[in-house]
């Protein structure tokens, strides 16, 4: 009887999740602007329920799109009719999700210390929040946990503060997981937190950084969305706020900042994955950071971490105008990418958002740069498309390790070039 009950509970949990059986991810290659526009027509056909992992940008830039099983034939016919090339990147999305769940289940078990915590698996929101508490308890002189707000659904929004003392010192901000389905980012954030406590006092270069600068690390920037990726829809990107007059849920928190808000590269359609919201900072998850940054007033570097595509980006995204500090930002990016690549040979591109990928309005680092935070950067971590958002857990630690080398480069530059 008990065995049957447990099986029923497990089955109920599985059945509650959105199913992606037969969904494929296509990689579309566009040769000219006319083909880009044709793919944008596809993007507007809501009945197909397409999920663009990498949207149409410009000729030569790959487009990745998850296509639900019922829409596959129609999409392929459309592409072939217009001479647009494509390959199948992921044959069946659900197979990767099943592998991910099996790996997580096999790695379950509550860690009592940060040394026994498993950094090579994906964790739930509760497990990450537990990890934060353990880390603070182990290093009370170095780490504290701040609540900077509450999410739309009432979850606490936490930031870890790493500091060796002093009031309102110059600071570095790092956030991960603003797009909830980008699981390798939150997992990397957890690894960064542990790395900071390990390297302080051991690595002279990092010790110098933390002796002079505070570090604020927001590991789960979109807690509602992240919880939803675990409970119901692994592919959820946005927040979970409700928009009056629409059945569609959520806002893209990386289109909700007051920097070119509502311009090209964001959508006014609440059902779009890039819906910008009704007004700037409408999302409490964004407003909490805005208020924190403004109240602090001394943040010198701001780094927002996404996946995937293997990019290091700096402003601007909403306009073609180059930032005043373009040459310096470009040189830092070049050095950071070289450091990252030195570990495993992972290749990254770098440049401004609008010239490297596409125009995007209302983005995080455009706002921070406009607020006077000169060293504003955004990462897109592994990979370049084999797995996309479903990066195997075996790549978490290598991804975090190589990214840390790039972060160190940015942090050292920030320390050595005060402004």
Swiss-Prot record:
Bound how, and how many: what does the cofactor note say?
A: Binds 1 zinc ion per subunit.
Q: Name one Pfam family in it.
A: Peptidase_M14
Instruction: Give a yes or no for keyword Manganese in this entry.
Output: no
Kindly state which reaction or reactions the protein catalyses.
Release of a C-terminal amino acid, but little or no action with -Asp, -Glu, -Arg, -Lys or -Pro; leukotriene C4 + H2O = leukotriene F4 + glycine
Q: Which molecular function term from Gene Ontology is one that the record holds?
A: metallocarboxypeptidase activity
Q: What sequence ranges are listed for the domain Peptidase M14?
A: 121-414
Q: Does the keyword Zinc apply?
A: yes
According to its UniProt record, where is this protein mainly located?
secreted
- Which InterPro entries is this protein grouped with? CPA_M14_CPD, M14A-like_propep, M14A_act_pep, Peptidase_M14
Q: Which residue ranges traverse the bilayer? A: none
The cofactor(s) it depends on are:
Zn(2+)
Q: Which residues take part in binding Zn(2+)?
A: 179, 182, 306
Q: How does it assemble?
A: Monomer. May form a complex with proelastase 2.
Q: What protein name applies here?
A: Carboxypeptidase A1
Q: Which species? A: Sus scrofa
**Which lineage is the organism of this entry classified under, starting from the top rank?**
Eukaryota, Metazoa, Chordata, Craniata, Vertebrata
Q: Which gene encodes it?
A: CPA1
